[in-house]
């Protein structure tokens, strides 16, 4: 008697952890187990298959799906909850499978309504997952967030911003498909367990509107002492809310999280009770016993010489489907709306070009424009800064003071501000001066441009006047968090080979937090799809100088930061991702974003013409 777990080379790393637990459980029950990748193992005497449908079916060719004969010798472990994508597909397999186990208690009655008998797999404490051991330990990470990215999860993290003020976080939301670079940057296996053993709280948010409990995230967290703060789940037995984990409604999560993080005694109580419970009531031997019973029954029913036939027993992995690359989207026939948006964008570009030229002529009759005027601010004997914050300004009188004050409130001492006023026509410069005068401790300079040259030229001027090796780019309508500059500078210190560093940014609208930007690790592969990194990043000045700074080519108007990331990628440069909230991006006003998103055809065309790697198959 032996078992073969059918896995996929393209599966989510969480399923690798589950397979490891199943192998260990069967070993405790005296059943040797192997793992077959991307196909079912060849039939043999006493062989029983174990299949987690969600780990296998999405990642292999249909020819590698189990046949009816194979299913009759297969134990299913269904990880999906009722209503979740993939649940009905797993249920269809369960109609023929020898036995079906589920992780979600709510799946048992749902499958029963379909005439399928399913048993709850008593998964709990897995020794291989537990690197903590229950001993007292320092936990430097206040909050960890793991799992696939969804707009809902992103908004929950954005809403939790106040609870994270002054605290450390590890925000790892995964973008699918899982590319090699993304997989390498995503905590899994031993790295994930180490993260959980160093985290005080793990935040669980339903990916969609369903209320299923995420067992594959919760159990490794409990095994390593990370307390679960979950959105209100439906079926979570045998765990008890308030004893083994904490829960709250979606819009109450931030308040609940803040209260939990501020209560060390409560954290310790929940941590201990949850850990002791899964060790005592859900040992891995119980999983082994349940699987052994099902394996014995399956072997007896099939007979030792079943010769069960299946499909081809050769690996047949399937390349994961991802978003359509921009080069393919561009080849699609444009709609009437696309044509109108493209024409409107061209009109706006021409209008801005004309306005800029008129301002130049107004400033100087011959159109050349006066030179920039530089005014030093703050202490004249300020030490060499570690970070220069370049703030570009053009007619943002209502928001510039907030942006500058956020720099002054940074917990990094060695910082200067370089304010570049791009010939504002309102009282933006006066407001900025007043804000800087209130912060005498903040050194730097004001660069007053004689004529408006546009955003990329203003940023390049700021970088040219910066004294620090690290330059953070801040627009006049955004704010940097108190710890943001320090986190990014520390990242560049740790990774001398990185050319820039960026962190997670909250997107905030008039009604409050909306979602996240810059939440994915550096991977040039994704530049074929979209610009996923905001301009608010910390640049190594020497690297920016190598690529020539921000382009002033009007073909990239509104896309200057995207062009910079593509330029750096084409030079083999890289960015260091910091999985913490570092800044707020404000929306709901007229901004360069409106021009960027109005029409994308011209921008993509210019990028494809300049950077060959963007045209390569994604």
Model regions and ranges:
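Catalytic binding pocket for nucleotide-activated donors in carbohydrate/polymer assembly enzymes
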Residues: 3-7, 20-21, 26-27, 31, ...
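Glycine-rich, basic loop-to-helix element that forms the pyrophosphate-binding segment
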Residues: 449-466
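Short, acidic, metal-binding catalytic loop of nucleotide-sugar glycosyltransferases
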Residues: 405-414
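N-proximal low-complexity "stem/linker" segments adjacent to membrane-targeting elements
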Residues: 342-406
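Short aromatic/hydrophobic "clamp" motif used to bind/position activated sugar donors
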Residues: 471
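Conserved donor NDP-sugar-binding/catalytic core segment of glycosyltransferases
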Residues: 483-515
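Extended catalytic core of nucleotide-activated donor transferases of GT-like folds
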Residues: 2-116, 127-130, 238, 426
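Conserved nucleotide-sugar donor-binding catalytic segment
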Residues: 524-605
């Amino acid at each position: 008697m032996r078992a073969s777990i059918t896995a996929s080379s393209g599966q989510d790393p969480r399923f690798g952890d589950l397979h490891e637990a199943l192998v260990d459980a069967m070993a405790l029950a005296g059943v040797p187990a192997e793992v077959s990748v991307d196909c079912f193992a060849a039939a043999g005497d006493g062989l029983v298959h174990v299949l987690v449908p969600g780990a296998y079916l999405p990642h292999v060719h249909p020819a590698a799906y189990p046949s009816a004969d194979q299913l009759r010798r297969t134990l299913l472990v269904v990880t999906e909850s009722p209503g979740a994508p993939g649940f009905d597909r797993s249920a269809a397999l369960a109609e023929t499978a020898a036995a079906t186990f589920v992780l979600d208690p709510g799946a048992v009655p749902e499958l029963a309504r379909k005439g399928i008998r399913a048993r709850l797999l008593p998964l709990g404490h897995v020794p291989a997952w537990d690197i903590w051991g229950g001993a007292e330990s320092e936990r430097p990470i206040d909050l960890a967030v793991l799992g696939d990215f969804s707009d809902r999860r992103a908004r929950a993290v954005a809403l939790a911003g106040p609870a994270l003020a002054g605290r450390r976080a590890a925000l790892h939301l995964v973008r699918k498909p899982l590319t090699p670079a993304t997989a390498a940057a995503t905590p899994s296996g031993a790295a994930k367990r180490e993260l959980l053993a160093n985290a005080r709280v793990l935040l669980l948010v339903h990916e969609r509107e369903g209320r299923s409990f995420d067992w594959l995230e919760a159990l490794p967290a409990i095994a390593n002492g990370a307390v679960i703060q979950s959105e209100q789940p439906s079926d979570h037995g045998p765990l008890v809310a308030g004893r083994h984990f904490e829960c709250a409604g979606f819009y109450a999560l931030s308040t609940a999280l803040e209260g939990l993080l501020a209560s060390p005694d409560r954290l310790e109580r929940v941590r201990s009770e949850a850990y002791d419970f899964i060790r005592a009531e859900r040992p891995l031997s119980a999983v082994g016993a349940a699987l052994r019973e099902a394996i014995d029954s399956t072997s007896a029913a099939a007979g030792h010489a079943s010769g069960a036939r299946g499909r081809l027993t050769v690996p047949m992995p399937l390349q994961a489907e991802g978003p359509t690359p921009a080069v393919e989207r561009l080849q699609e026939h444009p709609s009437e709306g696309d044509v109108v948006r493209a024409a409107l964008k061209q009109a706006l570009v021409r209008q801005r070009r004309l306005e800029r030229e008129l301002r130049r002529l107004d400033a100087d009759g011959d159109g050349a424009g006066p030179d920039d005027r530089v005014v030093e601010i703050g202490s004249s004997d300020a030490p060499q800064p570690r970070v220069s914050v370049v703030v570009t300004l053009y007619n943002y009188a209502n928001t510039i003071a907030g942006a500058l004050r956020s720099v002054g409130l940074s917990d990094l001492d060695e910082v200067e501000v370089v304010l570049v006023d791009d010939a504002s026509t309102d009282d933006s410069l006066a407001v900025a001066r007043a804000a800087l005068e209130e912060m005498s401790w903040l050194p730097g300079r004001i660069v007053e441009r004689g004529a408006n040259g546009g955003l990329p030229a203003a940023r390049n001027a700021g970088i040219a006047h910066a004294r620090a090796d690290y330059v953070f780019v801040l627009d006049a309508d955004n704010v940097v968090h108190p710890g943001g500059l320090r986190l990014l500078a520390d990242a560049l210190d740790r990774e001398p080979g990185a050319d820039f560093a960026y962190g997670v940014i909250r997107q905030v609208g008039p009604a409050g937090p909306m979602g996240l930007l810059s939440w994915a690790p550096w991977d040039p592969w994704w530049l074929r799809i979209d610009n996923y990194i905001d301009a608010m990043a910390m640049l190594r000045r020497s690297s920016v100088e190598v690529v020539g700074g921000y382009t002033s080519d009007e073909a990239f108007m509104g896309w200057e930061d995207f062009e910079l990331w593509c330029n750096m990628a084409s030079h083999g440069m890289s960015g260091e991702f910091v999985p913490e909230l570092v800044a707020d991006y404000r929306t709901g006003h007229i901004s360069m974003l409106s021009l960027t998103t109005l029409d994308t055809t011209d921008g993509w065309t210019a990028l494809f013409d300049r950077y060959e790697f963007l045209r390569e198959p994604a």
